Amino acid sequence: MAEKHRQRIVIAMSGGVDSSVAAALLKEEGHEVIGISMQVWDYANFAAPEGEKFDTCCSLDDIHDARRVAEQIGIPFYVVNFEEEFRRLVIDDFVDEYFRGRTPNPCVRCNQRVKFELLLHKARELGADFLATGHYARRVRGEDGLYHLLRGLDPAKDQSYFLFTLTQDQLARTLFPLGEMTKEQVRRLAAERGLRVAEKGESQEICFVPDDDYVRFLEEERGTGLMAGEIVDRKGNVLGRHGGTYRYTVGQRRGLGIAHPTPLYVVGVDAERRQVIVGPAEELLATGLTATEVTWVVPPQGQTVEASCKIRYRHQPVPCTVAVRADGSAEVRFRQPEKSVTPGQAVVFYRDDEVLGGGWIEGRL
């Protein structure tokens, strides 16, 4: 590589195979690569069952793995402690949202407020030209001079949904080295290089809820017995009682404790009245939704956008019309009714492979 193309790049290292391979590839391309892991949560109070290990990211074990990989490929490595900021910007929001009767997505908030804000700022302090991550997403610069965010080439691993908040300034300083690869290719590259994390499992759970028991976590944060109340139908008929609105999310069927001739699902959560609203499956259907905090990777042309949207990560994109409002909100109409529109989740707008933008679901239409 010619010297003029050599860049200083900070790579966010989680200790997993993806960011490890991304770091190795950037080093092999001749760049000056600096590995950084974020310490965001104290795992001292969590112990995995004997012989088992939590499938999460950002633990001390993961940081140790990242450090060893950095040593193996020959790059400097640092740990930045963002525990206080992560608590304030991600965890407190997660807890507050559940107690408002909403179902949050902390991974999007972490990307928005920590990784591509605080860590990107740290990269700039180190004089880096770019921050690279192991996300399966693509970034291209169009003929219009603007940066465009695209799905990762591997549809099974695409993580563009979690990145919809990225701005032009952030994209200009971000690299996704794995965007054109499949997971199988990444593991093969790791094995070929003898990286110790080549066969390491993938993180599955929320990093600060490693046992996936979010109810336990919320009750440790706020106490037990809070937000208890009635289970009602759409007409207000009382069908039972519940131990806390935060225990329920739209679409949930299990754990209602109600004997009823037809299957009932959670169709709404009214935290103010401490009510969990249930109904048959057809009451889960919505013709659209309202969204707040709507942001656009590339500014839309006009007040109406024809797109497809995902209302949760594993949701298949569906055709929709987005009515853009001046106050940063939007009204989204589906072409066909969709199930389980969940307040607090992210709605992300696509056109083919391109991420147009997204926002946070406020309510259903």
Curated annotation (Swiss-Prot):
User: What is the annotated localization of this protein?
Assistant: Cytoplasm
One Pfam family per UniProt:
tRNA_Me_trans_C
Molecular functions per Gene Ontology: ATP binding; tRNA binding; tRNA-uridine 2-sulfurtransferase activity
EC number, as in UniProt: 2.8.1.13
Q: Where in the chain is the site Interaction with tRNA? A: H135, Q345
Spell out the reaction equation it catalyses: S-sulfanyl-L-cysteinyl-[protein] + uridine(34) in tRNA + AH2 + ATP = 2-thiouridine(34) in tRNA + L-cysteinyl-[protein] + A + AMP + diphosphate + H(+)
Q: Where are the transmembrane segments?
A: none
Q: Which UniProt keywords apply?
A: ATP-binding, Cytoplasm, Disulfide bond, Nucleotide-binding, RNA-binding, Transferase, tRNA processing, tRNA-binding
**Swiss-Prot/TrEMBL GO biological process terms:** tRNA wobble position uridine thiolation
Disulphide bonds annotated for this chain are: C110-C207
Instruction: Give the active-site positions.
Output: C110 (nucleophile), C207 (cysteine persulfide intermediate)
> Is Nucleotide-binding found in the keyword set?
yes
| Any Gene Ontology CC annotation | cytoplasm
The segments labelled Interaction with tRNA in the record are 157-159, 312-313
HAMAP family attached to this UniProt entry: tRNA_thiouridyl_MnmA
In the record, the note on similarity to other proteins reads:
Belongs to the MnmA/TRMU family.
What name is this protein filed under? tRNA-specific 2-thiouridylase MnmA
Which species is this record about?
Geobacter sulfurreducens (strain ATCC 51573 / DSM 12127 / PCA)
